[in-house]
């Protein structure tokens, strides 16, 4: 699955450029004709659907044209996540979730419950900050984090911040072991 995120600016910003131009640059840089998932990055307010309509419209056209298969948002605020759950434009939500309630937008239980509502609506759910933005990386904490993400959360998949092949191998081994139950 090829996913990327697009930084956005408020309505009226001189930094805004046409979505199609940004997507053309992304596709050239990645050497691809399309992206499976494209997210509006770092939504921090519940009104993102109003303030980011320019981008939503551009991505809706790209989706219609087959340049993007699914669209969504990365959430960095509770209200932004609620908006993502309720907004039919949003196919995928990237949300901060871990069993330590570290660097999240609510309690572990509340975020997981909200994501359960999104899951029932057919949205794709990707977890981030699984290790609490690198604050919970002891062996026991990594195990607990992966076990939670794989067996207890409403996530479909997760992104992990890793710094080495050994860390990647460790994470894969933990996911595979926990997925087998």
Protein language model annotation of sequence segments:
Residues 1, 6, 24-34, 61-63, ...:
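Intrinsic structural disorder
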Residues 1-11, 38-41:
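A short, structured active-site edge motif that brings together acidic residues
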Residues 22-30, 80-82, 114:
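Short, charged beta->alpha transition segments
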Residues 27-47:
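Active-site groove signature of glycoside hydrolases
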Residues 42-181:
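Beta/alpha (TIM)-barrel catalytic core signal, keyed to glycine-rich beta->alpha loops juxtaposed to Asp/Glu
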